[in-house]
């Protein structure tokens, strides 16, 4: 049987296009824009146009349960992301998984900007002007745990500072401070990608962080 996927915040349907082309998946989606929905529909079984903040997901998708629900770059845009977590619990199959991605508010470039008294919203990136919620590794796992979810796996996307929107800010730090920050856990993690299940005791210890990246810090600091 085909894998059933619900893509929340599907946008123009890039994920659906990939899954429909390369995998045996039946995909439903939801997006805020009718224009985006029109682009997505060729690859999705159903695409609903609605606001995640106010819609009743359980009612919109009441006849289905899913093997995977995807919230890719979604939770940070919501005032009450816990509402979506509650709805997803009802829509997952008994063995289903929630796939999420969120930006890392502990990225060293963002922290460097804060240290210089700035918190500058941008058109895109970690401080996208539409972001309402911010997460670090610990706070993400705590947030999920408090709302009845556990992390089964957690991966990261890293971005070197010269490739980020914060390079200029980091360049103004004293060298000793820059070296210290680059050595902290998740310093260069730009985004977290997680797999979660309802009620699962977090397999990735919420207090666990990767070891200090001394070698990486030394190498990277030599760029500045």
Model-flagged regions — what are they?
Residues 11:
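Conserved glycine-rich SAM-binding loop
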Residues 14, 18-56:
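Class I SAM-dependent methyltransferase SAM/SAH-binding core
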Residues 8:
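Conserved beta-strand/loop positions that form the S-adenosyl-L-methionine
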Residues 58-68:
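A short acidic, Gly/Pro-enriched loop at the edge of an enzyme's catalytic core
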Residues 14, 35, 39, 52-55, ...:
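S-adenosyl-L-methionine-dependent methyltransferase catalytic module, highlighting the catalytic core
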Residues 1-2:
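Conserved alpha-helix/loop element of class I SAM-dependent methyltransferases that forms part
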Residues 68-74:
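A short beta-strand submotif of the Rossmann-like class I SAM-dependent methyltransferase core
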